[in-house]
Structures are given as structure tokens and as C-alpha cells.
């Protein structure tokens, strides 16, 4: 079965890692059926990519019980903490899956996702790491395929480089729309509450060092 062995610890909301071969075969059993088969409802789905400990996914799920949340990370040991917290607090509208982010289009059907959060990803600053930036054109194209027509993407990062890089890409795209942009969300007013009310462990470390936190909300 697909449920991971960690389910034996009372964590039925963690799904095992899908191998690249399994996903590329196109036979992932929940593709196009996450809401119905996993969440047992028809609510919209929000993804958190590179979810780390799952802090953002869990808190967003707690605040938005009528939305389904899925955290994705290649390292399952990271989000085990988030899954445990969700289990302890009976937050049943958040799940986690261990998978490579570049394979999202094999995990989800076209138009299956309503919103994406990318929180504090590695900015991959060197040129040779461009292909690994989670907001490069190739990744944006993958996100566009799984987002519905009104779907949006949120990028929250301490990297002014990644913030500027992403804005530059969006401004050069024909159909992209920047809904909100702020290069220092805690110093400048007007930030969406979901961008400032939830702080991850690492975000608090950045803030303690007076590092600005940037945020962009956009459509593609």
C-alpha cells in the first residue's frame, strides 16, 4: 500500500516516497483524486513545496479548515514533525508526501491545485544552479499545468536575490500577473495576513538577525 510505515506511529497523514520510475509511469493512484480519495471532500487544494518541517502547511490548515493542504519535500524526516503536530492537534486537512518537486505534474492532474506556497527555498544563487531554483521558467511551467485558472503562487523568502530574480521573470512573461510584492513584509504595511501571521523556525532566526523577509503573490 501507499501509506508509509510511519502510519504505525499514528501518522496516517504521511505518504511514502514515490520513486521516479513509479511516478513517470503515470500510474500514481491519487493523481486527479486527492480531494476525493485522500481528504474525502471536494475542497480546494493548496500545496507547499519544499515544506521542511511542515510548519506553514499545518498552520495554514488549522486556520483554513475548508481547504486541503499538501506539503511536499524530498526529505521525509523534515516533515515528520509537522505530521506529528497535525495528528496531535487533530488537524485532518493537511497531508505530506515525500517526492521530488520537479515531478509535481505526475502527482497532480491539470487544474487540480488552487494555490501554491514556496517558503524559504534554497535560492541556488550560482548560475550553474539556476535549474534548481523553484521559480525558474521550467518550474513555473510545471506549476501552471496543475493550477486551476484562478490559481496563484506565493513565494516567501529571505533571499532578495530570489525575490528579484522571480519578479524579473514574471515581468518578462506575457500572461503573468503580480498580485502583491513586498521586499520587507514586516517593515512595510499592507502584507497579506497569511504572509506575516505564520513564522517558521528559520524565519524567526532570520528576523532575529534583522534580515528582511520578502513576499510575492502572483498568477501565471
Question: Which sequence ranges carry the predicted segments?
Answer:
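Class I SAM-dependent methyltransferase "Motif I" SAM/SAH-binding loop
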Residues: 50-52
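Single conserved hydrophobic/aromatic residue that forms the stacking wall/gate
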Residues: 1-15, 159
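A short acidic, Gly/Pro-enriched loop at the edge of an enzyme's catalytic core
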Residues: 106-115, 120
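Class I S-adenosyl-L-methionine
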Residues: 173-220
